[in-house]
C-alpha cells in the first residue's frame, strides 16, 4: 500500500532510520524513540495476525517486512542493563519481570496482553493505554533513559519488546509482520512508554489510557496507513522527535539519516505511516469507534483471560483491585491516579492467575501460549509492556507513595526482600528453582544472562542486522522459540515475582497509607470507606478482613466482632482498628499479607484508621513497615490501632527498620503539624503522652479486655494527668476527656506520635481509644454518649463515658449558664492545665485538626487565656488559632472567663464535637483531626460514616445531642463530600486528598458546629435554637457540612486557605467563639480565617466580652449588627465566602447567649461570612443582616427574635435563645443577610422568599441566602441544607425551608422581611405547598441550575450571591438531593420540640439518602455535583464536597 511519506521531522529521519535500523529499537529499552515509530515486533502477533494481517496488509505494505523492517532485529530480551536498571531502579515489579531474556521469555500469554485478535484500533487503544500508563515511568527509569537515549541501542541486551514481538510473530498462527508495521507497532510500544504515554496522554488524555493499561504490543499499524499517516503526520513529529536509536539495520546504520530514510524510506515511510497510523489510532482513540473497540478489546482482553482462566476474576477478587475498581468507579480522580495501580493489579493478578496458567500451559512456550493464547496472543514479552508495567509499578508506587521512588526503592528493597521471601515462599510454584532469586537476583541474573541463547540470538539478530532478514527471521524465530521457552520460565518466575510484587504492592499500598500521613491515610481510608460504604456500617475492618485473607478474616472477625458489634460503623471501625487492630493486628497483618491487608490495613488501618488518625500515629510508625513489607503487612499495616501496640510494636519495629524510607513516602505531619504536635505534645505529652506511649508499647497481643484495662489504667493515668488538666471539669474531672485523650493521643501520636516509637504511648492511646470507643459503644444512648460524654472522656470507656453522660445529663438539666459556667470552668481548667493538641498531618489537616483540636485543645487543654497566650502555641500550631488567640489575645483572655462560658459550652461543644468527631465529626476522625495522630480511632469511623454510609453512619455515629429541652438531636455527620475536591495532598489519590480528610477535619471543625449540635448539648437551653443550631447542628453537621461544605467552603476557605488550619481553627473557634476566637483568630473566632478576620475585625465581637456580656440583646444585637455589618463588609472584603463557611461553623455559637450572639455575630458574621459569599455578593448584607435577624432560632422554645431588620436587635427573650437565634439569626442573619440582600433584592428574595418561607422571610431568605450563600455555607444549614438545597434553591429551600421551618418554625413566623414567597412554616411543613410556593423559586433555581449556579435568577441577592449560589448551589445541590426527603424526614425524625432536625436533615443530607431525589428534583444538584469538585478547589470546595 502506498504510504504517505511521513513528515520528516529533524528527528524523523533518524527516527525512522533508527526504527528501521534498530531491531533493538523494538525494545523499549533500546529504541525508545525508535520504538515509537518503527518497532515492528511490538504488536501482538495474534492480534496482528488475524486483524493486523488485514491492517498490516492495509497499513503495512507487507507483513513479511518483518525481515525487511530492521525492527525485526529483536533483542532476545530487553537489555540486561534495562532489566538490571529496572531492578536497580527498585522497579521491583519490573525487575521481577525484567529478566531481560526471561522477561521476553515469559509467555506473553502469561504476561497479560491483549487478546490475540485485537483490532488494530484495539491494539492501538491498548498501546495508548499502555503508553498512557507508560508515562508513569520516572525519568530515572532505565526505560525512560533508554527511551530518551539513542545509545540505548548500544546497550548489551536487546529490548525485550522487539524479541517479544517477533517472538509472538513466531508464535503459531502468529505472523511475524516483517513490515515496518510491525516495526512501527513495536517501536511505539517499545518507545519508552513514558514518552509514548506522555505524548499520547498529551494527545489523548482519554481516561482509557489512565484507566486500563493495555499491553502495548498491539499493532498500531492496524489503522489504515493513510489515516495513520495523516494522523501520524500530525503526531509523528513528537514521536519522531524522540529519535529512536538507530539500530543496526540491514540498511547500513552508517547511512545518513537521509540515506537511511531513502534506503529505508519505504520501510520508514511505512513505519512513519504506521507511526502515523499508530498516532492516528491514538488520535482516533478519542473517537468512539476506537474507544468502543478498545472497550471491546478490554473485554476481550480481560475476558479471554477469565475465559481462559477463571482466575482472572481472582485479581478482581483481589481486595486491592476490588478496592481500586470501586474507588475507580467512585472516585474518577482516584481511579485515574490509581488506574495505573489498578491495571498493574489487573496485570499482576492476572499474571498471578496466569502463573497457574503458565503452570498449566507450562513450559511448552507454543502450547502454553496457544492454550493461553486464546486470551492473549499479544506477546507479553513485549518490552513495552514490561516498561509499562515498570512504569505502572512506579506510577502505582509513586501515586500510592507520594514519594514513590525513594519509598519505592525502599519498599522495593523490602519487596525484593519480601519478594525473595514471598517468592521464596511463593516459589512453591516450582518456577522458583530459578525464581528463588528472580525477584531480586533471579530476574536480574536472568536478565543478566547474555549467555542465554535468546540473548545470543538477539545479539546475533542485532549484530546480524546486516545479515539477510531471512536469516534474521530464522534467528529471530529461533530466538523466539528460545524466548518462548525462557519466557515461559521467566514468565512463571515473573508471575511469581509479579504475584509477590503484587502482594508487595498491595502490602505497600496497605503500608503506604500507613506511611502516608494521616491525611493520605484518611484519604485512603476514605477510599476504603468509599468503596465499602455499604460495608462501613459493619466496619471497614470487618470488610477488609472479610475481603482480606481468611487468616486476617479470622482474626479480624474476632477483633471486629469484639468491638465491631456495637462499635460497628462509628467506633467499630476505630475499635476494629483498636480491637480489630489489636485482635486484627495479626489479622491486619494477615490482611496486610492479603490484599485485604491493604483493605484491612487501609480499611482497618485506614478505614478503621480513620484511625488514620490512629494510623498516623502508627503512620509515623507504620511507614517504616514499608521496608518490612511482610512485617509491615503483618505488623505495620494494622497501623496500630492507636494504641494497638500489637501492630504498633511491629510497625515500630518496621519503623525502626525503615522509618527513613517511609519518611519520603509518608506524608508525615508537616513540620507545622509536628510543631503543633510538639506544641500540643508539650502539654499533652506532659499529660498522657509518655504514659500513653509507654503503655502502648508491647500490646501486641493485647486483648480487648486487656486494652480496656490498659485504657482504664491509661485513663486513670491520664485522669491523673488530665484530671489536673481538667481538674475544673464538672463531671469530667479526674477522668481524661476525649479532648484529653486527643491531647494525649495527639501528643503521643501527632506526626505519627511524638513518641511514635514509644509504643506505650500508642498503647495507652490505643487503650484510650478503645475505651473511648467502648464508651461510645457502651453509651447506648447516643444522646448522652454522643452529646458530650464520649468526646469529653475518651479513655475510661463506659465509665468516663457514663460520667460524661451524666455530666451531659446534668448539663442538660442544668441551666445554660450553669452548663456554661461548668464548661467554662472545665474549659478554663482544661485550657489552663491541658495542652492544646492540634494535629494535622498536612497543613490543611493541621488547620482543620488544629481548628478542631484547637477547639478541644484550647477548650480542653488550654484556657482561652492560654488560647490567647497558650494558644500562641495553638497559634503557632494553628495559624488561625494564633490569629484568634493573638488578635483576641487581650480580649480573649479578658473574655476568657466569658469564653470559658462559651468555651465551657465549647468544652461541651468540644466534647460534643469530639463525640461528633468520634461519631462522625471527621473522616480524618474528629480525633484524628483533633489529635491528628489517628490514635483516636474513634474518629475514623465517623469519617468512614461520612464517606461511606452517610445515613447508616450518621444513624449509628451521629452523636445524639441531648438538647437542653431534652430533645435528642443527631448531630449529622458530615461526610467529606469534598472528597472529590482536590486536597493539598495530591500524594494521595485526589479524592483521598486532604480535602476529604479536611472535609472530615472541617467536620471536626464543624464538630465545633457540632459544637453547635454540641451546642445543642450545651445549648440544651438553646436547644431548638441549637437545633436551629442543629440547623446549626445541621450547621454543626452542616457546619460539618459547612466544614465539609466549608471544607468545600473550607475548601473555599481552602481557597482562602487550603490551610484548613485557619479554617479548622476558625471552625474550632467558631464554637470557641467567640470574641476570643474571633478576636483571637479569624478562623478561631468565626470559623473562617479571613471570615473570622472580618468577623474578628467586625466581630472581634467588638470585645470578646461583648459576646459574653449578658447584654446579649444589646451587645449581641448591636454587636451583631455591628459585627454583621462590619463583618459582612469585612467578610466581603475578607473573601469570606469560604471563611464565611467557617464562620458559619462559628454558628456553633457558644450556647452562652452572648457568646452565641457573639458567635451569632460571629455566626452572623460567620454566616455573613458564610453569606460573605452572599455578603461578598450581597454587600447589602449588613443591612440585610440586620433585617434577617428577624429569624427566630427556635420556633417553640425561643420567641422569634425579631431583630430589627436594620438593627438585628434581638427583640426576643433569652439571651441564650437570642444568641442562639442570633446564631440562628447568624445563620439566618447571614442568611438573612443574604436574604436581606435577597430581601433587598426581593426579586431573588422571591426565590429566597420561598427560602424565606421556611425561615422568616428574612430567615428564610437568610436560609435561602444562606442556602444560596450557605449553599456554600452549609452553616445556615438548617438553611444550610436549604442552602445546599439552595442550589435547589427553591425546592430544596422549600424542603429545606420546610426543614428549617420545621426546625425554624419560628423562622416561618417572621415571614416579613420582604419574603414575597415567604410562608411561615409551622413545625409541620407543607412540602407540596412549599414546592408550590417554591415553584417560582424552584423555577428560578432550576433556571439557575440550568444556567449555572451563578445564573442570576435563582438567587437575586446579587452577583456575589450568585457566586455563592454557584458555590453554594453546587454544595447545596450536592446535598440537596437528600434535603428534599430530609425535610419530611426531619418532620418526623426531627419532631423534637426544636425542629432542629435540619442538622439531622443535613445529616440525612450528609447521608445523601435523598440526595439523589434532590438531584432528581433539582437539575442544578447534579450540575452542582458535577461542578462541586471543580468548585471545591475554586471556592475551597463546595460545601458538601
Curated annotation (Swiss-Prot):
Question: Native species of this protein?
Answer: Dictyostelium discoideum
Organism phylogeny: Eukaryota, Amoebozoa, Evosea, Eumycetozoa, Dictyostelia
GO CC field: nuclear pore
Gly residues composition bias: which ranges? 881-892
Q: What is this protein's name? A: Putative uncharacterized protein DDB_G0293878
Q: Where is this region: Disordered?
A: 1-95, 150-204, 224-289, 401-477, 529-661, 680-760, 776-810, 849-899, 980-1118, 1161-1185, 1209-1321, 1348-1402, 1421-1441
GO molecular function terms listed in the Swiss-Prot or TrEMBL record: structural constituent of nuclear pore
From start to end residue, where is composition biased (Low complexity)? 19-38, 57-91, 153-187, 227-283, 416-445, 555-564, 572-635, 648-661, 680-700, 780-810, 849-880, 995-1067, 1088-1118, 1225-1249, 1257-1291
Gene Ontology annotations of biological process type = mRNA export from nucleus
Biased composition, class Basic and acidic residues, residue ranges: 703-720, 1362-1373
Q: What ranges does the record list as Polar residues composition bias?
A: 39-56, 636-645, 729-751, 981-994, 1068-1087
Amino acid at each position: 500500500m502506498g504510504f504517505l511519506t511521513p513528515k520528516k521531522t529533524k528527528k524523523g529521519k533518524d527516527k525512522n532510520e533508527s526504527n528501521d535500523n534498530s531491531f533493538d529499537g523494538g525494545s523499549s529499552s533500546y529504541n525508545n524513540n525508535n520504538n515509537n515509530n518503527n518497532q515492528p515486533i511490538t504488536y501482538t502477533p495474534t492480534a496482528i495476525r488475524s486483524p493486523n494481517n488485514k491492517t498490516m496488509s492495509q497499513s503495512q505494505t507487507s507483513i513479511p517486512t518483518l525481515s525487511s523492517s530492521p525492527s525485526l532485529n529483536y533483542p532476545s530480551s530487553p537489555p540486561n542493563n534495562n532489566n538490571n536498571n529496572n531492578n536497580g531502579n527498585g522497579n521491583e515489579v519490573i525487575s521481577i519481570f525484567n529478566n531481560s531474556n526471561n522477561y521476553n521469555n515469559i509467555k506473553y500469554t502469561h504476561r497479560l496482553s491483549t487478546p490475540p485478535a485485537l483490532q488494530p484500533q484495539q491494539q492501538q487503544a491498548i498501546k495508548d493505554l499502555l503508553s498512557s500508563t507508560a508515562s508513569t515511568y520516572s525519568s530515572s527509569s532505565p526505560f525512560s533513559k533508554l527511551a530518551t537515549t539513542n545509545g540505548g541501542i548500544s546497550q548489551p541486551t536487546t529490548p525485550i519488546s522487539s524479541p517479544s514481538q517477533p517472538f509472538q510473530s513466531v508464535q503459531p498462527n502468529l505472523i511475524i509482520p516483517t513490515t515496518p508495521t510491525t516495526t512501527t507497532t513495536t517501536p511505539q510500544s517499545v518507545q519508552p512508554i513514558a514518552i509514548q504515554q506522555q505524548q499520547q496522554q498529551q494527545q489523548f488524555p482519554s481516561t482509557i489510557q489512565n484507566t486500563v493499561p493495555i499491553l502495548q504490543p498491539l499493532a498500531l499499524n492496524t489503522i489504515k496507513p493513510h489515516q495513520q499517516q495523516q494522523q501520524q503526520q500530525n503526531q509523528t513529529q513528537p514521536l519522531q522527535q524522540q529519535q529512536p536509536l538507530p539500530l543496526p539495520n540491514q540498511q547500513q546504520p552508517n547511512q545518513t539519516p537521509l540515506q537511511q530514510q531513502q534506503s529505508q524510506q519505504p520501510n520508514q515511510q511505512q513505519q512513519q505511516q504506521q507511526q502515523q497510523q499508530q498516532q492516528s489510532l491514538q488520535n482516533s482513540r478519542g473517537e468512539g469507534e476506537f474507544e468502543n473497540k478498545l472497550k471491546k478489546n478490554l473485554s476481550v482482553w480481560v475476558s479471554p483471560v477469565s475465559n481462559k482462566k477463571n482466575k482472572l476474576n481472582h485479581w478482581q477478587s483481589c481486595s486491592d483491585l476490588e478496592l481500586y475498581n470501586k474507588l475507580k468507579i467512585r472516585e474518577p480522580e482516584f481511579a485515574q491516579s490509581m488506574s495505573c495501580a489498578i491495571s498493574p493489579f489487573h496485570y499482576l493478578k492476572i499474571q498471578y492467575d496466569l502463573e497457574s496458567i503458565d503452570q498449566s500451559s507450562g513450559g511448552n512456550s507454543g502450547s502454553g501460549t496457544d492454550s493461553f493464547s486464546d486470551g492473549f496472543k499479544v506477546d507479553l514479552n513485549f518490552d513495552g509492556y514490561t516498561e509499562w508495567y515498570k512504569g505502572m509499578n512506579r506510577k502505582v508506587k509513586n501515586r500510592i507513595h507520594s514519594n514513590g521512588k525513594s519509598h519505592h526503592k525502599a519498599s522495593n528493597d523490602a519487596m525484593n526482600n519480601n519478594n525473595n521471601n514471598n517468592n521464596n515462599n511463593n516459589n512453591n510454584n516450582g518456577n522458583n528453582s530459578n525464581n528463588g532469586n528472580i525477584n531480586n537476583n533471579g530476574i536480574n541474573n536472568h536478565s543478566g544472562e547474555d549467555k542465554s541463547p535468546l540473548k545470543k540470538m538477539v545479539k546475533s539478530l542485532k549484530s546480524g542486522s546486516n545479515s539477510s532478514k531471512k536469516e534474521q527471521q530464522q534467528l529471530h524465530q529461533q530466538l523466539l522459540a528460545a524466548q518462548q521457552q525462557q519466557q515461559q520460565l521467566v514468565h512463571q518466575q515473573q508471575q511469581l515475582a509479579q504475584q509477590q510484587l503484587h502482594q508487595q504492592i498491595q502490602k505497600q499500598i496497605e503500608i503506604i497509607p500507613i506511611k502516608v500521613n494521616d491525611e493520605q491515610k484518611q484519604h485512603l481510608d476514605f477510599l476504603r470507606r468509599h468503596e465499602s460504604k455499604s460495608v462501613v456500617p459493619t466496619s471497614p475492618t470487618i470488610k477488609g478482613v472479610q475481603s482480606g485473607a481468611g487468616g486476617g478474616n479470622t482474626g479480624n472477625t474476632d477483633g471486629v466482632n469484639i468491638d465491631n458489634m456495637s462499635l460497628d460503623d462509628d467506633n467499630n471501625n476505630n475499635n476494629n482498628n483498636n480491637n480489630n487492630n489489636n485482635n486484627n493486628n495479626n489479622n491486619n497483618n494477615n490482611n496486610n499479607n492479603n490484599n485485604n491487608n491493604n483493605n484491612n490495613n487501609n480499611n482497618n488501618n485506614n478505614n478503621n484508621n480513620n484511625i488514620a488518625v490512629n494510623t498516623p500515629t502508627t503512620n509515623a510508625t507504620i511507614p517504616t513497615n514499608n521496608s518490612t513489607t511482610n512485617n509491615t503487612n503483618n505488623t505495620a499495616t494494622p497501623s496500630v490501632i492507636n494504641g494497638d501496640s500489637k501492630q504498633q510494636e511491629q510497625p515500630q519495629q518496621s519503623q525502626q527498620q525503615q522509618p527513613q524510607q517511609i519518611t519520603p513516602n509518608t506524608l508525615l505531619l508537616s513540620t507545622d503539624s509536628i510543631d503543633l504536635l510538639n506544641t500540643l505534645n508539650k502539654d499533652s505529652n506532659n499529660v498522657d503522652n509518655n504514659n500513653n506511649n509507654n503503655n502502648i508499647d508491647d500490646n501486641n497481643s493485647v486483648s480487648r479486655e486487656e486494652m480496656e484495662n490498659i485504657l482504664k489504667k491509661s485513663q486513670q493515668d491520664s485522669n491523673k494527668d488530665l484530671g489536673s488538666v481538667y481538674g475544673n471539669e464538672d463531671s469530667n474531672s479526674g477522668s481524661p476527656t476525649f479532648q484529653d485523650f486527643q491531647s494525649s493521643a495527639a501528643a503521643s501520636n501527632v506526626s505519627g506520635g511524638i513518641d511514635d516509637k514509644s509504643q506505650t504511648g500508642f498503647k495507652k492511646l490505643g487503650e484510650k481509644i478503645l475505651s473511648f470507643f467502648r464508651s461510645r459503644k457502651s453509651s447506648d444512648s447516643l444522646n448522652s454518649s454522643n452529646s458530650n460524654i464520649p468526646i469529653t472522656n475518651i479513655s475510661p470507656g463506659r465509665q468516663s463515658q457514663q460520667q460524661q453522660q451524666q455530666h451531659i445529663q446534668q448539663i442538660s438539666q442544668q441551666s445554660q449558664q450553669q452548663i456554661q459556667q461548668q464548661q467554662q470552668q472545665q474549659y478554663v481548667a482544661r485550657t489552663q492545665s491541658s495542652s492544646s493538641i492540634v494535629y494535622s498531618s498536612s497543613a490543611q489537616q493541621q488547620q482543620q485538626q488544629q481548628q478542631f483540636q484547637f477547639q478541644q485543645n484550647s477548650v480542653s487543654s488550654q484556657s482561652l487565656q492560654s488560647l490567647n497566650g497558650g494558644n500562641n502555641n495553638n497559634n503557632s500550631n494553628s495559624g488561625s488559632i494564633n490569629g484568634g488567640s493573638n488578635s483576641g489575645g487581650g480580649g480573649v483572655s479578658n473574655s476568657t472567663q466569658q469564653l470559658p462560658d462559651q468555651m465551657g459550652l465549647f468544652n461541651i461543644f468540644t466534647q460534643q464535637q469530639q463525640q461528633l468527631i468520634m461519631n462522625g465529626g471527621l473522616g480524618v476522625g474528629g480525633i484524628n483531626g483533633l489529635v491528628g495522630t489517628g490514635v483516636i480511632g474513634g474518629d475514623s469511623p465517623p469519617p468512614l460514616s461520612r464517606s461511606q454510609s452517610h445515613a447508616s453512619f450518621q444513624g449509628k455515629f451521629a452523636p445524639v445531642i441531648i438538647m437542653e429541652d431534652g430533645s435528642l438531636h443527631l448531630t449529622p455527620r458530615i461526610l467529606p463530600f469534598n472528597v472529590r475536591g482536590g486536597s493539598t495532598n495530591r500524594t494521595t489519590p485526589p479524592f483521598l486528598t486532604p480535602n476529604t480528610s479536611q472535609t472530615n477535619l472541617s467536620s471536626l471543625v464543624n464538630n465545633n458546629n457540632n459544637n453547635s449540635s454540641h451546642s445543642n448539648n450545651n445549648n440544651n437551653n438553646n436547644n431548638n435554637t441549637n437545633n436551629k443550631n442543629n440547623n446549626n447542628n445541621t450547621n454543626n453537621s452542616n457546619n460539618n457540612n459547612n466544614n465539609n461544605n466549608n471544607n468545600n467552603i473550607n475548601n473555599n476557605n481552602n481557597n482562602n486557605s487550603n490551610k484548613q488550619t485557619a479554617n479548622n481553627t476558625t471552625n474550632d473557634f467558631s464554637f470557641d467563639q467567640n470574641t476570643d476566637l474571633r478576636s483571637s483568630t479569624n478562623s478561631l473566632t468565626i470559623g473562617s480565617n479571613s471570615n473570622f478576620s472580618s468577623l474578628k475585625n467586625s466581630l472581634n465581637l467588638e470585645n470578646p466580652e461583648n459576646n459574653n456580656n449578658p447584654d446579649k440583646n444589646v451587645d449581641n444585637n448591636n454587636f451583631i449588627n455591628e459585627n454583621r455589618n462590619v463583618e459582612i463588609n469585612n467578610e466581603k472584603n475578607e473573601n469570606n465566602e469560604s471563611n464565611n463557611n467557617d464562620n458559619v461553623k462559628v454558628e456553633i455559637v457558644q450556647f452562652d447567649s452572648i457568646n452565641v450572639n457573639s458567635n451569632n455575630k460571629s455566626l452572623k458574621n460567620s454566616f455573613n461570612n458564610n453569606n460573605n459569599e452572599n455578603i461578598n455578593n450581597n454587600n447589602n448584607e449588613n443591612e440585610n443582616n440586620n433585617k434577617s435577624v428577624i429569624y427566630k432560632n427556635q420556633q417553640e422554645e425561643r420567641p422569634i427574635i425579631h431583630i430589627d431588620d436594620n438593627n438585628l436587635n434581638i427583640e426576643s427573650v433569652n439571651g441564650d435563645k437570642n444568641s442562639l437565634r442570633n446564631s440562628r439569626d447568624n445563620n439566618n442573619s447571614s442568611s438573612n443577610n443574604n436574604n436581606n440582600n435577597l430581601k433587598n433584592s426581593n426579586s431573588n428574595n422571591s426565590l429566597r422568599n420561598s427560602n424565606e418561607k421556611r425561615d422568616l422571610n428574612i430567615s428564610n431568605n437568610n436560609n435561602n441566602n444562606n442556602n444560596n450563600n450557605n449553599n456554600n455555607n452549609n452553616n445556615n444549614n438548617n438553611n444550610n441544607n436549604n442552602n445546599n438545597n439552595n442550589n435547589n434553591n427553591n425546592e430544596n429551600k422549600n424542603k429545606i425551608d420546610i426543614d428549617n421551618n420545621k426546625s425554624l418554625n419560628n423562622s416561618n413566623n417572621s415571614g416579613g422581611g420582604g419574603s414575597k414567597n415567604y410562608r411561615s412554616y409551622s413545625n409541620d411543613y407543607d412540602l407540596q405547598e412549599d414546592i408550590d410556593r417554591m415553584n417560582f423559586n424552584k423555577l428560578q433555581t432550576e433556571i439557575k441550575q440550568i444556567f449555572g449556579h451563578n445564573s442570576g435568577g435563582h438567587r437575586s441577592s446579587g452577583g456575589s450571591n450568585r457566586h455563592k449560589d454557584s458555590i453554594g448551589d453546587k454544595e447545596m445541590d450536592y446535598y440537596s438531593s437528600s434535603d428534599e426527603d430530609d425535610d419530611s424526614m426531619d418532620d418526623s425524625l426531627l419532631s423534637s420540640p426544636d425542629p432542629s432536625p435540619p442538622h439531622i436533615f443535613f445529616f440525612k443530607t450528609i447521608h445523601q439518602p435523598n440526595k439523589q431525589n434532590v438531584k432528581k428534583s433539582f437539575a442544578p444538584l447534579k450540575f452542582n455535583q458535577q461542578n462541586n469538585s471543580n468548585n471545591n478547589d475554586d471556592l475551597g470546595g463546595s460545601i458538601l464536597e
